[in-house]
């Protein structure tokens, strides 16, 4: 879980910006999108295989 302690004399905007940066580094948005809908194991394997194929040829 990402958390940010607001420092003294720090604006809310800069604290929010730091929080968003921490969330992006932790990969929270990608994880939420990935878990939004159930994905069958066969579909997961297919996506994993396609990603490996893309990495190999690019």
Curated annotation (Swiss-Prot):
Q: Which GO terms describe its molecular function?
A: structural constituent of ribosome
Source domain of life is: Bacteria
Question: Cross-referenced Gene3D superfamilies, in alphabetical order?
Answer: Ribosomal protein S8 (1.20.5.1150)
Q: Which GO terms describe its biological process?
A: translation
Compositional bias segments (type: Basic residues) = 43-58
Q: Where is the composition biased (Basic and acidic residues)?
A: 31-42
Q: Report if keyword DNA damage is assigned.
A: no
Q: Which keywords fit this entry according to its UniProt record?
A: Ribonucleoprotein, Ribosomal protein
Residue numbers spanned by region Disordered: 31-58
Q: Any stretches that span the bilayer, and where are they? A: none
Q: In the UniProt record, does the keyword Disulfide bond occur?
A: no
Task: Please give the GO cellular component terms listed in this UniProt entry.
Answer: ribonucleoprotein complex; ribosome
| UniProt similarity note | Belongs to the bacterial ribosomal protein bS21 family.
Q: What is this protein called?
A: Small ribosomal subunit protein bS21
Q: Which species?
A: Agathobacter rectalis (strain ATCC 33656 / DSM 3377 / JCM 17463 / KCTC 5835 / VPI 0990) (Eubacterium rectale)
Lineage of this protein's species?
Bacteria, Bacillati, Bacillota, Clostridia, Lachnospirales
């Amino acid at each position: 879980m990402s958390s940010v302690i607001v420092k003294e004399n720090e604006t809310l905007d800069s604290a929010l910006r730091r929080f968003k940066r921490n969330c992006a580094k932790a990969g929270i948005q990608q994880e939420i999108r990935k878990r939004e809908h159930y994905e069958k194991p066969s579909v997961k394997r297919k996506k994993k295989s396609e990603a490996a194929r893309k990495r190999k040829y690019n």
